[in-house]
């Protein structure tokens, strides 16, 4: 990961345009290929960002350095760096990933057992299907035999959609699996996350944890 603190302006050029005037900001260049621009507020949320894969060019023109970050759709972040206060790179290695809380782990187990909740004809291929950047919660096949990656959360937020998007990009490079569709499943899905998922062709599924636990309860089983 590369960390840069700089006085800079930022322009986004793509389907829309956006401009951030000159200010001191933190620029994050991550090993996964993402770039994000942060201010000293907004918690973890960036002012602007570019999701992977994207490419960075750092030419020097005149008095200011213009860093151009471009994704495969041709959208650009143009970062005009006026002064750099800090520039360092760090090798963080492979992260073990977030350990799911009890509810998320139970949701995963229940959905794996009752995979028909995803749709008629769905079958489970594997839980915790490993990718180079971490495990997909469930890998399934739909009624037509097509691969489906399922990410399960207790609260469905934008970060979860981004995580599933990265998994899908990698899985779709595997000719034995592609094409791979995505399902974002959670007890509660925030409107912004649902909008982003829909825009990316990812289906959203709201899970009723209490009902699913009832399905798992011996009291409700005939045998």
Swiss-Prot record:
Cellular localisation: Cytoplasm
Keyword tags: Cytoplasm, DNA-binding, Endonuclease, Hydrolase, Nuclease
Main location: cytoplasm
Keyword hit for DNA-binding: yes
Record's GO cellular component terms: cytoplasm
Keyword Hydrolase: yes
Sample GO molecular function, one term: single-stranded DNA endodeoxyribonuclease activity
Class in the EC hierarchy, top level: hydrolase
Signal peptide (UniProt feature, chain positions): none
Known EC number: 3.1.-.-
Role this protein plays: Cleaves both 3' and 5' ssDNA extremities of branched DNA structures.
NCBIfam families in the cross-refs: PRK03298.1
Similarity annotation: Belongs to the NucS endonuclease family.
Protein name: Endonuclease NucS
Organism: Mycolicibacterium vanbaalenii (strain DSM 7251 / JCM 13017 / BCRC 16820 / KCTC 9966 / NRRL B-24157 / PYR-1) (Mycobacterium vanbaalenii)
């Amino acid at each position: 990961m590369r960390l840069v603190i700089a006085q800079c302006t930022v322009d986004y050029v793509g389907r829309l345009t956006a401009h951030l005037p000159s200010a001191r900001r933190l620029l994050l260049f991550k090993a996964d290929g993402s770039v994000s621009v942060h201010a000293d507020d907004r918690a973890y949320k960036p002012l602007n960002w570019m999701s992977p894969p994207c490419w960075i060019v750092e030419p020097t023109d005149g008095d200011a350095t213009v860093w151009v970050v471009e994704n495969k759709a041709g959208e650009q972040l143009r970062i005009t760096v006026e002064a750099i206060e800090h520039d360092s790179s760090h090798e963080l290695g492979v992260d073990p990933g977030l350990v799911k809380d009890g509810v998320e782990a139970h949701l995963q187990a229940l959905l794996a057992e009752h995979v028909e909740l995803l749709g008629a004809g769905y079958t489970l291929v594997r839980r915790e299907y490993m990718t180079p950047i971490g495990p997909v919660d469930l890998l399934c096949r739909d009624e037509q035999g097509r691969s489906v990656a399922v990410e399960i959360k207790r609260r469905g937020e934008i970060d979860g959609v981004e995580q599933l998007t990265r998994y899908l990009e990698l899985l779709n490079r595997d000719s034995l699996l592609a094409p791979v569709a995505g399902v974002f499943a959670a007890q509660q899905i925030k409107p912004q996350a649902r909008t982003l998922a829909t825009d990316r062709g990812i289906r959203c599924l709201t899970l009723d944890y209490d009902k699913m636990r009832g399905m798992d309860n011996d009291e409700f089983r005939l045998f």
